[in-house]
Amino acid sequence: MSVKLRLPHGRSDVAISCCCKVSGDVQQCYTAKERRLLQHTSAQLHAGETVTLQKLVWIDWRDDRQAVLDEWGSASLRQLEMCAQQSYDQLLAVSTENWRQWWQKRRITVNGGEVHDQQALDYALYHLRIMTPAHDERSSIAAKGLTGEGYKGHVFWDTEVFLLPFHLFSDPTVARSLLRYRWHNLPGAQEKARRNGWQGALFPWESARSGEEETPEFAAINIRTGLRQKVASAQAEHHLVADIAWAVIQYWQTTGDESFIAHEGMALLLETAKFWISRAVRVNDRLEIHDVIGPDEYTEHVNNNAFTSYMAYYNVQQALSIARQFGCSDDAFIHRAEMFLKELRLPEIQPDGVLPQDDSFMAKPAINLAKYKAAAGKQTILLDYSRAEVNEMQILKQADVVMLNYMLPEQFSAASCLANLQFYEPRTIHDSSLSKAIHGIVAARCGLLTQSYQFWREGTEIDLGADPHSCDDGIHAAATGAIWLGAIQGFAGVSVRDGELHLNPALPEQWQQLSFPLFWQGCELQVTLDAQRIAIRTSAPVSLRLNGQLISVAEESVFCLGDFILPFNGTAATHQEDE
């Protein structure tokens, strides 16, 4: 039996076909009830007799509508019929071999530690594969993957920052497809910017297939007024524009894909840069970015949020660099970009090394967050305070300045990153599933391995922990990417800085060995490391930096980590250089 669905207010069709086989002498009939197609099976059984039910489902989708609906639906049904000619064991064997080959190339292995750690990595990679529409660049990764209808399947900045890196270092063609999703939706982003009085592209906070803003207008109830509160993210959480540009540059530097950067990448960089240039306001002789929400999200409608301003600067800076490199003829843009970079005010690091989150954060009072941190992820702070009240205190939902330190590591010293971590983490409740992973990576870069592992482990328990209701609406898709990030960018110390691949490995004491695959500029690497040494096998000669020192690898090389010292200032030296 099959059903063809034409989605309302859309341009897509879905066909669902089902074949149910039942062993033995059975009677079957079919009915339709309340928009359901039902197959009824009855059988007379003796004690100990076994009946086997085999159900095969084929789901098809299209958005071109070139063929007549019935003809397309019949073609989809024929695909099911072809599969039904094979036995369950035959279909299982094909699937098993496909997964075997995939795991052989992609699996990350950990020796030592608890069984949970390896299971968490396997769990993360499994979902990172199945929930990514690698076959369709007009779709992206839903906030709940394929496991539930939370957030209505919408796409957030989570994709570019938490999910794309896995694909970038595992299968760059998938990362390219995810970025082309944003490129296809440029018209909607340009229209949103225009409606708000700006130029360039303002991508929606919650995105779907059309590229239009999908964020609901209202959400939770204000505990003081009893009224529904407006969702402010779509109005002012504009950092996702720069996050997308950051992902474009990460892709470009990791792959060297000139065909992409000269076309789709250039368009994304220029349009996002134009947005920031028009978004800035002049205050005396400087440009500032006002009325924004940073990743924190508990601090709303502030001026000069550090994350937003630094990322906007990076966005325009990289757009200008690519424009010059690939011969952009838009002289007006180049002039405006140069002036923006010259005049934009960036929050300055204080003498104690802390970067203020925004213009007003440091003047707000701090409160004891112990009971709220103990219930991290539950947003219990909003049971005691309204959002307006939370906004007037030093309270973070998730990493903000620490997130900036993670995304642009080359721009901040290790001392400043440590100062920010020590200042902001006690003020962070970790009410977002994404917060602890980022704190863990920055902690690892600062040499705080015990704290880093604790953050990573707690991040794995968001959906794999004791709470049976953590994924009632679906798993936290981005948190699966965060598990990979914590292991590879945290403990293995993988990062891309100024176009170079860096490895600054430091395993937690719970792990004796970590082995993982890595793609870099056309080369397939296999990296295996422990506390003393690192082995790198490559499909072609490659250069990278190990603890800051440039090394070359051909075929397979083993390095003693004791020969590569990483001082606190982040500049590597060998023992010989020290002498």
Task: Set out the residue ranges of the language-model regions.
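Acidic/polar, glycine-enriched structural segments that form the non-catalytic walls/loops
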Residues: 1-151, 385-389, 568-579
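The feature captures the catalytic groove of carbohydrate-active enzymes
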Residues: 61, 147-155, 205-263, 271-342, ...
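C-terminal beta-sandwich/jelly-roll accessory domains of carbohydrate-active enzymes
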Residues: 537-578
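Helix-terminus loop motifs that line ligand-binding clefts
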Residues: 132-147, 173-246, 252, 259-261, ...
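Active-site core of glycosidic bond-cleaving carbohydrate-active enzymes
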Residues: 155-185, 237, 246, 263, ...
